[in-house]
Amino acid sequence: MRDTTWVNGEPAEQLRADDRGLLYGDGLFETLAVRRGHVRHLALHLARLARGCERLHIAMPAQPLLAAELQALCAGRERALLRLTLTRGPAQARGYRPTGSELPTRVATVAAWPAPVSLPFRTRLSDVRLACQPLLAGLKHLNRLEQVLAQQGAAAAGVHEALMLDSHGGLVCGSMGNVYVRIRGQWLTPPIIDCGVAGITRQRLLEGAGGAGFPLREEQMGVAGLARAECIAISNVRLGLQVVHWHEGRELGVDPVLARVQEALDADGQ
């Protein structure tokens, strides 16, 4: 099936040129998986979107409306990838300052599920540092230039993913997902405090979705921690929980527990 886009609940492929999402990146987005016409973990994604709207003072559309639109858009799709973008809407005045009277624009696109990535999965440390801005930390906002630059560097280096540090040298995430590192048998993930996206899979794993065999905890680490990593994994909606086979040219171990964790994540479809 071809890609399908709805704008504000209607089939369309164009936005107004003065939409603040285009002008300033003034908005948020969610990427969701679709299985057998069902949008997976929709409640968790809409809850994160609502938190972002509250932080940015964007009027959040009614969640039942969004849920109904997304389920209708995805009806009949066996397996697909769905992106929901919410902008503050068309500008009501020139300049950065919103008037408060903007009407949000919602854009939903459903596309075929991407082909599997080639293996072995390789990562490198990005030359791009994430700027620290606690007001935006955790949000999946539309300003993604740091990730664009990091992915350009990854492509030039011939690797799949770039692991990103903040301006203080702390590990935060990958350019396209959260990161998990096993050190001395313990799986760790960096806290999302000053920057980075608080992913839905990461949230589920911290809440115990991986089962008793995958006790995950937050811990700050930097380059030295990565150097001691026995295993590394990346998560996002498309990849699931992806094992990293090589980091910076060093071959890593593969923890067999990750396959069981992925099975547990897949089984919990909500």
Please provide the spans of the model-predicted regions:
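Helix-start/capping segments and mature chain N-termini
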Residues: 1-64, 68-72, 76, 87, ...
